Amino acid sequence: MKMPLKKMFTSTSPRNSSSLDSDHDAYYSKQNPDNFPVKEQEIYNIDLEENNVSSRSSTSTSPSARDDSFAVPDGKDENTRLRKDLKARHISMIAIGGSLGTGLLIGTGTALLTGGPVAMLIAYAFVGLLVFYTMACLGEMASYIPLDGFTSYASRYVDPALGFAIGYTYLFKYFILPPNQLTAAALVIQYWISRDRVNPGVWITIFLVVIVAINVVGVKFFGEFEFWLSSFKVMVMLGLILLLFIIMLGGGPNHDRLGFRYWRDPGAFKEYSTAITGGKGKFVSFVAVFVYSLFSYTGIELTGIVCSEAENPRKSVPKAIKLTVYRIIVFYLCTVFLLGMCVAYNDPRLLSTKGKSMSAAASPFVVAIQNSGIEVLPHIFNACVLVFVFSACNSDLYVSSRNLYALAIDGKAPKIFAKTSRWGVPYNALILSVLFCGLAYMNVSSGSAKIFNYFVNVVSMFGILSWITILIVYIYFDKACRAQGIDKSKFAYVAPGQRYGAYFALFFCILIALIKNFTVFLGHKFDYKTFITGYIGLPVYIISWAGYKLIYKTKVIKSTDVDLYTFKEIYDREEEEGRMKDQEKEERLKSNGKNMEWFYEKFLGNIF
């Protein structure tokens, strides 16, 4: 059984990681020195003599000889290499754009309906704190040595089996998200054009063709397109926050000053049901809200996927991490705080949206707008929802293809998915991801909104499992740095709290993963569909990890044996070159005066 499986992939099976040599064998066994073309040396401007890279065809098993084959980042030849065309502004906007979608615009309505305003605010704030620590840990690793996705970090710093598990768990998540977003887009359009007039499959096809075209032409165009699309989303969110603030103060047409009225009546917390009341009922509702807060934040960790295509990642990744954290505070916490003040959890309009489609009619923002007496904005808002869904689907398809590519590069998926086009697009991985988008046609039915909620459950679990893995990998990475005496003060970015913050976030991420759907046990009838969709990610993750470990007999890499140096010199040099370019840019900005470029760098660059 082993041989056919091994032949499918680019690498032979990893061996036990009991030394630095065996760790290199385990993680880089797929890298054949003869596969690297000489022109790779020119592309990365590497002085082979200076870096002691003298023989790529050496058959020596010593670390130095084997390291010679790793002079080119990622060990990829011209046909399996991504293009480093993403700037810091692209990375941060792709990350925030991938998470600003239906989860925030529409999912907040279900969260408010489930737990009440304060329960929703606390849940979003707490999950936001976990996201902050997770992003910080990811940022430290990604800015030290950027690798291709989570699977590469897990395989290199912990265990190849963990890399396999998170790689496929994350892949399944992003096989599900694009078709689900396409379904949501078709449902949004039904706000204007009913399914009786135009079959939703028509809209799905149109959106799919456009999104595939954007992903095919290369990451530079994709990054620029997504930057402007996400910038529009940022502007919309800022506008909505301002509008909610005005409505709360009584600035709407009805001039009704709301203040904290709905926190008092009907209350800050909602009881779960008539059977579970009082403090117990409110606590149950509070815990139930975590499902929706998780879904709203999912995708914000995309920085770890796109950093391998980043220009000067040691500068761009930390900046993207910091900007993402600021946006969490503004977009998520300000939004849910103001929503809880403008809409009561027992509002008739909000109650009437329960179980409805993902159009503007199901959004708490529209409820707040309509309650204030504004008539025309719901149609404009629905158009904004459509843009949000389109952008999220665009990012999701990108991540799906890049994650499959990373698995292939790491030797954990068929090598055919590692091939890239002349624009640096992993076209075979993209084709398979597009094929899964066909699931969207199955979702277009009268019960599609219910199916969407089931997918929310699945994606939420896959999302938090990816956060758990990032935190585990960081803990091992930090332990290896301390064991090998690496001074973190010289890092481009260091996570606040470091391992203590990681342990804190890991504990609560695991706790939330275990209890997030416990409400299925509280009703009179066991909701097996919600239970299965809510927890199916756990057995998938565990079976993937255990199966790979049993087949390939891998072991957790010792802290003293973890490879913390391969590719480091290349990124050190790239960082130095980037610093020189930044100095030239600063001098140019000073000489040119305060023009638009200066204005963007100093002000707009901190927003977009």
Curated annotation (Swiss-Prot):
Residues 112-119, 178-201, 253-285, 344-372, 445-454, 523-530 are extracellular. Gene3D superfamilies: Amino acid/polyamine transporter I (1.20.1740.10). This is Dicarboxylic amino acid permease. Pfam families: AA_permease. Present with 432 molecules/cell in log phase SD medium. Its main location: membrane. The chain crosses the membrane at residues 91-111, 120-142, 157-177, 202-222, 232-252, 286-306, 323-343, 373-393, 424-444, 455-475, 502-522, 531-551. There is a cross-link at K76 (Glycyl lysine isopeptide (Lys-Gly) (interchain with G-Cter in ubiquitin)). The lineage of its organism: Eukaryota, Fungi, Dikarya, Ascomycota, Saccharomycotina. PROSITE patterns: AMINO_ACID_PERMEASE_1 (PS00218). The modification Phosphoserine is found at S22. Disulfide bonds: none annotated. It comes from Saccharomyces cerevisiae (strain ATCC 204508 / S288c) (Baker's yeast). Keywords: Amino-acid transport, Isopeptide bond, Membrane, Phosphoprotein, Transmembrane, Transmembrane helix, Transport, Ubl conjugation. One of its GO terms (cellular component) is fungal-type vacuole membrane. Residues 54-64 have a biased composition (Low complexity). It is a multi-pass membrane protein. Belongs to the amino acid-polyamine-organocation (APC) superfamily. YAT (TC 2.A.3.10) family. The keyword Transmembrane applies.
